[in-house]
Amino acid sequence: MLISLPKVRGIYRYDILMSKATWLNVGGRADILFKPRDIEDLTCLIKNTELPVSVIGATSNIIVRDSGIRGITVKLGKEFAYIKSKGNNSIVAGGAVLLSNLAHFAGNQQISGLEFLVGIPGTVGGGIEMNAGAYGSDIASVVQSIKAVNLEDGNLYEFSSEEMGYFYRGHSLKGNWIFVEAEFKGVNSEYELILQRLKEVIERKNKSQPIRGKTAGCIFKNPKNYRAWELIDKSGCLGLNIGGARISKKHCNFLLNYDNATASDLENLGNKVKDAVKDKFNVELEWEIRVLGSY
């Protein structure tokens, strides 16, 4: 069946194998991948299509199911990878900017407070969506304002950090959004001190996480009053595997694709861990990794 797509200035690509595009190297085919030229191009697409629209960023925290993704998958490209200083220790960044690049840019501007981002392998847009954080800091603590396009009506909105209603690994906005730009604010500091903190974050991550494996970051959010990895460990899940998927022995809140795992292997293993923790502690773990696609 032929589908009429809106006329855009960006790029449509078709039948994209997502296992070649995700950090976990799993997933079926996306029907249509769209990279908009700018915000206007993005809003034009959403307002003029009846197909379902999904959003991906760096694909560092997603499992795309083996069945793939139906409809249109939007990925912000280089046109949204800009960073600029506004003065007064403020930075404006597009939604496609890597969080690690934002941290280094801030350091070069002698702006402190964003160092924790250097160890998070995602984009500004994805980080805003999940209130990404590490080592006691999170996006909510440094973001000032956000521009977002609503996936239902296609309109552009701007929100303050307070209006986002941030909480641990999430926000309170209703509906589905794609975050296209954000303004961040830090504090002035000496470059050498910032550089040292950046190195400390990287070293801490390298020591505690399986950075050389095919992973998607932490599997589960930390439940209130608990650490997910401790619950997983005490539930006997360290090194557990299904097919080519394994729970990391270095950090048991990480899934590994260690031997040509399928998306089903990874998702089933995560759910097996959830069940084990529920049985042992009566605590319900919540996925931090996003799962895209239908069964």
Curated annotation (Swiss-Prot):
<dbReference type="GO" id="GO:0071949">
    <property type="term" value="F:FAD binding"/>
</dbReference>
<keyword id="KW-0961">Cell wall biogenesis/degradation</keyword>
<dbReference type="InterPro" id="IPR011601">
    <property type="entry name" value="MurB_C"/>
</dbReference>
<comment type="similarity">
    <text>Belongs to the MurB family.</text>
</comment>
<keyword id="KW-0131">Cell cycle</keyword>
<dbReference type="GO" id="GO:0051301">
    <property type="term" value="P:cell division"/>
</dbReference>
<dbReference type="GO" id="GO:0071555">
    <property type="term" value="P:cell wall organization"/>
</dbReference>
<feature type="active site" description="Proton donor">
    <location>
        <position position="218"/>
    </location>
</feature>
<protein>
    <recommendedName>
        <fullName>UDP-N-acetylenolpyruvoylglucosamine reductase</fullName>
        <ecNumber>1.3.1.98</ecNumber>
    </recommendedName>
</protein>
<keyword id="KW-0274">FAD</keyword>
<dbReference type="InterPro" id="IPR036635">
    <property type="entry name" value="MurB_C_sf"/>
</dbReference>
<dbReference type="InterPro" id="IPR003170">
    <property type="entry name" value="MurB"/>
</dbReference>
<comment type="pathway">
    <text>Cell wall biogenesis; peptidoglycan biosynthesis.</text>
</comment>
<dbReference type="Pfam" id="PF01565">
    <property type="entry name" value="FAD_binding_4"/>
</dbReference>
<dbReference type="GO" id="GO:0008360">
    <property type="term" value="P:regulation of cell shape"/>
</dbReference>
<keyword id="KW-0521">NADP</keyword>
<keyword id="KW-0132">Cell division</keyword>
<dbReference type="InterPro" id="IPR016167">
    <property type="entry name" value="FAD-bd_PCMH_sub1"/>
</dbReference>
<comment type="function">
    <text>Cell wall formation.</text>
</comment>
<keyword id="KW-0560">Oxidoreductase</keyword>
<feature type="domain" description="FAD-binding PCMH-type">
    <location>
        <begin position="26"/>
        <end position="189"/>
    </location>
</feature>
<dbReference type="GO" id="GO:0008762">
    <property type="term" value="F:UDP-N-acetylmuramate dehydrogenase activity"/>
</dbReference>
<feature type="active site">
    <location>
        <position position="288"/>
    </location>
</feature>
<dbReference type="InterPro" id="IPR016169">
    <property type="entry name" value="FAD-bd_PCMH_sub2"/>
</dbReference>
<dbReference type="Pfam" id="PF02873">
    <property type="entry name" value="MurB_C"/>
</dbReference>
<keyword id="KW-0285">Flavoprotein</keyword>
<keyword id="KW-0963">Cytoplasm</keyword>
<dbReference type="GO" id="GO:0009252">
    <property type="term" value="P:peptidoglycan biosynthetic process"/>
</dbReference>
<keyword id="KW-0573">Peptidoglycan synthesis</keyword>
<dbReference type="InterPro" id="IPR006094">
    <property type="entry name" value="Oxid_FAD_bind_N"/>
</dbReference>
<feature type="active site">
    <location>
        <position position="169"/>
    </location>
</feature>
<dbReference type="InterPro" id="IPR016166">
    <property type="entry name" value="FAD-bd_PCMH"/>
</dbReference>
<dbReference type="InterPro" id="IPR036318">
    <property type="entry name" value="FAD-bd_PCMH-like_sf"/>
</dbReference>
<keyword id="KW-0133">Cell shape</keyword>
<dbReference type="GO" id="GO:0005829">
    <property type="term" value="C:cytosol"/>
</dbReference>
